[in-house]
Regions:
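Gram-negative/organellar outer-membrane beta-barrel architecture
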Residues: 116-122, 219-408, 435, 475-476, ...
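Bacterial N-terminal signal peptides
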Residues: 2-10
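Strand-loop-strand
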Residues: 543-552, 556-558, 562
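C-terminal outer-membrane beta-barrel translocator/porin domains of Gram-negative envelope proteins
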Residues: 232, 251, 372, 379, ...
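Periplasmic polypeptide-binding modules associated with outer-membrane biogenesis and secretion
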Residues: 17-29, 35, 42-277, 283, ...
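N-terminal signal peptide c-region/cleavage motif recognized by signal peptidases
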Residues: 12-14
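Short, solvent-exposed loop/turn segments at secondary-structure junctions
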Residues: 96, 181, 537-541, 571-573
Length: 592
């Protein structure tokens, strides 16, 4: 009565519709749902509103609050509300107090799958997390579970499946609810004829990219994988893989593939790193050389420490999305630390094959290398270096470029019969893993282990020696600045005959051990903050002392650029006359 009298006093007076609403008793998703269903909430930002309109909206509060709580299992809430007329600032003030009451709990949960697909494991994932007896009733959880069953049926070819029973029974006397779901799967459909509309390669070549065969049980995920495989083939600018209308008579689904040919492409990239200085990449790609689907690529990479010119010819073999035979010709010049540099011309036939979660690369490198260091000055090698690589690939990998691997292992070697100055074998193992501790906290673990078997490291070409230090190794040290130290030969002054002693030079080591532990916290605006610990060394024996460093970093990740800034301080620096000061590590990688 008091509320009605209050409203009557302003019934004929228009008021600014700045309505302030206070809600007590509920929070989180329930509070948000209450606000979403409140008419007053939707009208509160109107420029002007009549008092009688406010009265009508106010009278809806009880029903709207009850409707908002029902999906969360609260069917009998107690709602207390009040309203104050416009104050000095002409604001309405509405207070709503909600006591949700006793929740409705699930009692019987009956889920049955009948029909020819009753025992098909494709429904296993959908059935893993059904609503549980004793849980508070949630309409959204019920709908999500029911939808998961229907999606599983549609995804895996049970296109005639239907819910013959779908009941949610609520007993307000006992505050119990029962769920009854019964799915009749019907027959599973199979892949029918596939029609392919493309002109890039021969028809039988493109069919090797299909992730299914005619007559296989229908699986929509294999259509998606086919789309990805054709996209990653580089033959096409656009690809559509479409399922047609299913045929109830034959229980088949026809498939159509439409693809438009890709043109020869250019790509460019620029960046900056503390290790590399300014860097740039230019690539020219011929996605299809002929109707057999052969590919050709020319790539140029330039930085202060490395210059690379690479020409590669790829021939798809086996499963063409995953396997290939390649011919690679490259010329490379690289600087290792301050004392060692290498020039390398190599021709490398290789065979790449993917076996489950592993990619294997077998190659034979025919190399002409020139190593320059202060010990032997200039050393020329002409040798053959066989190599085998095993690298992990993600689940459902389809040949796309990978910028990091959780595990990468390489074994190479050569003998004097193959041109090496001395027999050697070299093993390199790299691992990297990101563990999501929560939605905002991430743990990065990175390690590398290397070992070589050779009598004299100076007889090994420079590009096969181990160094440590730098942006992706041990921060707090400059690029490749951690290495065993050798003395250059003593010389005599030609004028005076005075003996000039040798100087220390970092020429690389037989073995390598490095590790990183980094914790990153996501921040607003695509930022992240990190703290890290790095350790390791490149040495000629594994019991050599290790270097350590700690630091902090800032990350910025945008669609067009990635920026990383780290400041690291060395804690231990074996082989250095004094402990280096703090070092800045900057890496800018625009995506062009």
């Amino acid at each position: 009565l008091l509320t009605a009298l209050t409203l009557l006093t302003v019934l004929t007076r228009p008021a600014l519709a700045d309505i302030k609403i206070d809600i007590d008793g509920v929070d989180g998703d329930i509070r948000r749902n209450v606000l979403a269903l409140l008419s007053l909430e939707r009208y509160k930002d109107r420029d002007r509103i009549e008092a009688d309109a406010v009265q009508r909206l106010y009278n809806r509060i009880d029903d709207e609050v009850r409707s908002a709580l029902r999906p969360f299992g609260y069917y009998e809430p107690i709602v207390t509300d009040s309203i104050q007329p416009p104050d000095a600032q002409r604001h309405w003030h509405v207070r709503i107090s909600i006591d949700p009451g006793a929740p409705v709990l699930l009692d019987t949960v009956s889920v049955k799958i009948d029909g020819p697909g009753a025992q098909d494991p494709v429904f296993k994932t959908a059935l893993e997390h059904p609503p549980q007896r004793g849980e508070r009733l949630s309409h959204s959880a019920y709908d999500q579970f029911k939808g998961a069953l229907e999606r599983a049926a549609a995804t895996y070819g049970y296109l005639d499946a239907r819910l013959v029973r779908s009941q949610l029974q609520v007993n307000l006397t006992t505050h119990k609810a029962d769920i009854y779901l019964q799915l009749d799967t019907g027959e599973r459909y199979r892949f029918g004829k596939t029609t392919i509309d493309q002109t890039a390669v021969r028809d039988h070549e493109v069919r090797r990219y299909l992730r299914y065969k005619e007559g296989d049980p229908y699986d929509a995920l294999q259509l998606l994988r086919t789309q990805f495989a054709l996209d990653d083939s580089l033959y096409y600018s656009t690809v559509e893989v479409l399922a047609g209308d299913h045929d109830p008579a034959t229980h088949t689904v026809p498939i159509t593939v439409h693809a438009n040919n890709a043109r020869r492409g250019y790509s460019f990239g620029v960046g900056y790193g503390t290790d590399t200085g300014p860097r740039g990449t230019a690539t020219w790609t011929v996605p299809r050389v002929n109707s057999l689907g052969h590919r050709f690529r020319v790539q140029l990479e330039l930085s202060e420490i490395e210059q690379l010119f690479d020409v590669r010819y790829d021939v798809p073999v086996g499963d063409p999305a995953l396997d290939k035979f390649s011919l690679d010709l490259r010329g490379e010049q690289e600087q290792f630390g301050n004392d060692v540099s290498s020039k390398d011309i190599a021709f490398a036939p290789s065979f790449t094959r993917t076996l489950g979660p592993w990619q294997r690369i077998l190659s034979v490198n025919l190399e002409h290398t020139i190593t320059t260091d202060p010990i032997e000055n200039r050393k020329v090698d002409n040798l053959v270096v066989p190599s085998i690589v095993f690298a992990s690939v993600p689940e459902n990998y389809l040949g796309e470029a990978l910028f990091s691997r959780e595990i990468y292992a390489q074994l190479i070697g050569s003998t004097t019969e193959l041109g090496a100055k001395e027999n050697f074998i070299r093993f390199d193992l790299q691992g990297e893993r990101v563990v999501n501790l929560s939605s905002r906290w991430h743990l990065l673990l990175r390690a590398e282990f290397g070992a070589s078997n050779i009598k004299d490291i100076e007889d090994m070409p420079g590009l096969y020696r181990f160094f440590a230090g730098g942006d992706r190794s041990i921060r707090g040290f400059s690029y490749d600045d951690l290495s065993p130290i050798s003395l250059t030969p003593s010389t005599h002054n030609p004028m005076t005959g005075e003996l000039i002693p040798g100087v220390a030079a970092k020429v690389g080591g037989r073995d390598l051990l490095t590790g990183t532990v980094e914790i990153e916290r996501d921040l607003p605006r695509n930022l992240g903050a990190a703290v890290f610990f790095d350790g390791g060394n490149a040495a000629d024996r594994f019991n050599a002392p290790l270097a350590y460093s700690v630091g902090v970093g800032l990350r910025l990740r945008l669609p067009v650029v990635t920026v990383g800034v780290d400041v690291a301080q060395a804690l231990r620096a074996p082989g250095f006359p004094s402990l280096p000061g703090p070092r800045l590590h900057l890496n800018i990688s625009p995506k062009l």
